[in-house]
């Protein structure tokens, strides 16, 4: 009995693979995900695929279908697909906050791409002045000429250890600093949540990357690229889902699903091309 169960579990793990922790019984390539359209309203997980498209001049330039639930993990495969198709990487890959991660920023640096993907806290960093300038955030702690980081109360923070970040491809490490003495601190209630000396995590490289992203996206060019992305990328999905009523994949298996999405994308591009040619003819 145990041997039979063990074989069953081994087979399930083999189907699931290393990159995910679930699969559908009716389609082994599909992964259970939370989708935006929750008809039952009970936060139910449903078998799905993560469809990614790259849009340029209103045309779908590249398509990819993934089993990853997170958009962050889909960015690099999509860029590699773009390179395979066109022989170069896009100079300005603009994306929303779901794509900004250390792995993706390093990938951009290695392949000559500028960092124009928002990170998770981008909106809060750029719109919430109180949060951005909070003196009790570790990134705002001043560093003296002696290289020692100090809190608003003037206490020193010393490096305790470094820790590798789980699931990181490029050896990202976080530094853990601890305050020398928090006892009797007048800012204790504002600064920390425990009775122990405060410990903060710092990744200066990632913080610098976030600052670079903010500068890029807050520039005039960045604002135009962001606006263009929201119109073209979101607009493309809107047209396909709402105007064409393509809201559900009908094929099973990742290869068949990719073929289906390719066909839908070709149809979208032909429709766009026809409309543009029609406008040119009308204007002439």
Q: Where are the regions that the model predicts?
A:
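Anion-binding and metal-coordination hotspots
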Residues: 1-284
């Amino acid at each position: 009995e145990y041997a039979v169960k063990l074989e069953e579990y081994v087979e399930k793990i083999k189907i699931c693979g290393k990159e995910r922790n679930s699969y559908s019984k009716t389609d082994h390539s599909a992964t259970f995900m939370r989708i935006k359209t929750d008809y039952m309203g009970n936060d139910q997980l449903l078998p799905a695929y993560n469809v990614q498209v790259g849009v340029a001049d209103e045309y779908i330039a590249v398509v990819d279908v993934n089993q990853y639930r997170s958009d962050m993990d889909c960015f690099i495969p999509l860029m590699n697909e773009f390179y395979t198709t066109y022989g170069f990487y896009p100079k300005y890959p603009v994306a929303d906050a779901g794509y900004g991660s250390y792995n993706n920023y390093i990938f951009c640096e290695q392949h000559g791409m500028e960092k124009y993907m928002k990170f998770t806290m981008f909106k809060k960093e750029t719109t919430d002045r109180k949060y951005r300038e909070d003196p009790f955030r570790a990134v705002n702690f001043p560093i003296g000429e002696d290289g020692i980081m100090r809190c608003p109360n003037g206490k020193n923070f010393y490096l305790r250890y470094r820790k590798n970040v789980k699931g990181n491809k490029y050896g990202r490490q976080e530094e853990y600093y601890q305050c020398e003495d928090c006892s009797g601190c007048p800012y204790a209630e504002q600064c920390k949540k425990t009775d122990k000396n405060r410990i903060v995590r710092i990744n200066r490289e990632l913080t610098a990357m976030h600052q670079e992203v903010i500068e890029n996206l807050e520039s005039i060019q960045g604002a135009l690229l962001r606006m263009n992305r929201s119109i073209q990328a979101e607009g493309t999905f809107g047209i396909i889902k709402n105007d064409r009523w393509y809201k559900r994949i009908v094929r099973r298996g990742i290869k068949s699903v990719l073929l289906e999405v390719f066909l839908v994308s070709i149809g979208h591009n032909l429709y766009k091309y026809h409309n543009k040619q029609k406008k040119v003819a009308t204007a002439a």
